Amino acid sequence: MKRQWIMASAGLLVVAGIALPYGTGYLTEQQWQRASQEVNGSQTWLEMQVGRYDRGFWSSEFEGKLLLRDPASGEELSVPYLASVSHGVTGSLTDFKPVNGWTPAGESWFGDDAPRLTAETRLWGSAVAKLTVPKFSITDDDNVETVFGSGGVVRVNGSLGADAVDISADWPSLVIASEEVDLRLSDLTLEQEMQRLSGDIWIGEGTLALQSLELMPANADAIMLRGLSLYSNSEAINDNSALDSFISVKLDELQLAAGDTLGPHRIEFALKGLNVEAWNAVSRSVTDMQLAAFAAENGDPTAFQQQMQAMSDVGESLQLLAAAGFSVGFPDIHLVSPDGPLQGKVLITHPGAAGDSEALLIMPALAGEMELSIPLALAENNEDVRMQTAPLIKDGLLVTEGDRLLLKATLKDLVLNVNGRPIPLPPLL
């Protein structure tokens, strides 16, 4: 009896070993078809086409094409590919290769290696795409330019139907050399989490960091940037009807050829209360205007009417955006010069409109404030800065306070008050 159970169990394992990969292969094929439909329906610049699909028990092969479109010009770039699929018990691994290879005919950018693009999918719908680029060297003889680097890795994690994606990248080094300038990047990393909120609007959190960037012009002094980072965060508010967005750019050090090291530098940008529906309308209207301009270039007799309608739609959607209320600006600006720090902030707010007041002019409701403080020595010692600040000082828009030049301005009721000097503004909308 025990022997019979062992034989039966072994038989079940054999059947499962055959059936499960086959079932996985079937589901993988369905997932690719569904993924293509989702990608093609979510935007207009990329189209995934899946053609012949030969499915086997433990592996499959299929061919397809990627179409990259420029929405403004209508130009297309077609990239045909072949894919080899290995089936497992809980998922599949797909290896993609361009039909025409990774490099133009006669070129050897990657030496004996080649990039590898794979996608690992699971039965429950999750997927991980990974692009691995080996060490490379690309030379453009026409422009006398060379690009070479250590290679890198890019990963994209997502799920079918989830409208969420995580992106990461790691690029140790990249050099762009030409007769005019050499550019060297070191340790570039990216971490980005994204979720679709509505239409073309995505929210999430991300960080882009670069350990160093060296710029070496042929006819000027070299500049080195160390510790450059960009942080962004967008989140939905008011039951997903609006969003807040924040961006921070930081630089630890700026090293000049003379040996001076300046830093740290910081610039922050904030956007609050952006209406999602109105912003989607703005995006659609701008796209329509670009398409109409392209149609006009190709002699479409209806293009002028399309352009006029698109311009009208842009104006209406912008008015709806402002009527919903918003706040935008740079709450913190901190830059370091050889003569001391430059500090400031710029904030603009619109309270929004209610009821019949939506049809009123928008500009009168705008309010804002601006502050700027720069070293007096910077204006005195730097000719370019002096030429820019001299007219402002003469008109009282910049005032001297100790060893600083100050500008304080407020905007309210169509009056811009700069250092106590009122400047009436015309209504623009």
Positions of PLM-derived features:
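Positively charged n-region of N-terminal signal peptides that target proteins for export
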Residues: 1-5
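Glycine-rich, small/hydroxylated-residue low-complexity segments
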Residues: 6-8, 16-429
